[in-house]
Amino acid sequence: MKQHFYLLLVFALWALVMTMASCGPKTKGKCGIAASGLAMEFASSVPDVNDALTPETEVHPDSVLKSHIIRQQYLDFVFIALYWSVFFLIIGRSLIQSPARTARILGWLVCVCISVAAIADVLEDVAILIALGGGQSIWPLWFGVPKWTFYFLTMGFSAALFFLRPGSVFRVTPGPGFSLLVSASGVLLMAGSAAGLAGLAMFLLSCKCGGIIGPSSFLTGLPVILLIIQCFRNFRSQPAVRT
């Protein structure tokens, strides 16, 4: 359980690093996506790449913005390993170890979906680096769509952890106030999943609401914080080993 605590803590800190690295001017983007990094994830042509690199107040692509996006991709390789570990090793495996059949099924779905999302994310980062280098052999859109689809599905299935509360994670029983926050975390994950999938569908079908996709994933924030607290309480409650 101590390992889970440290993994979650590193994941949260790296997510903060990723958020800071993604800060920058709004760009012309694609279908309402103003964040340059996210806009690049859905680029499928040279004009899409140029729009993702062009601030909305400028006419030509910004070379400094291009270097920022390149740096984001290398940071993202670490982030992929971290979020896969959190969802697979902590959330998915905890549900699989539950005696309830429904929890085990949802746990396997979490593990499968986050694995597909992580693989697609790696390929997406590679495609972005190729596109920024002038290559046109593969486009980020081909991998960005499945990545976000399976990531949002993972969020939805992961909500089960906060409703079913398997003993491997919730060994220390939450108090009334904390219990309410745990349930709220499950609701947030389901809401983020639904909003993200809806935004992705609108983006693909009518080139609208692309700006919803990124913020929907931020709803994992409270659940992660609560898991950090819960894992800390769990290992603090363990009796000291006598030597």
Predicted regions and their residues:
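N-terminal membrane topogenic signal
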Residues: M1-L9, F178-S185
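Membrane-helix boundary/juxtamembrane motif in polytopic membrane proteins
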Residues: F162-A191
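Individual transmembrane alpha-helix segments
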Residues: P55-Y83
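Interfacial helix-loop-helix junctions of multi-pass membrane proteins
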Residues: D125-L141, C207-G211
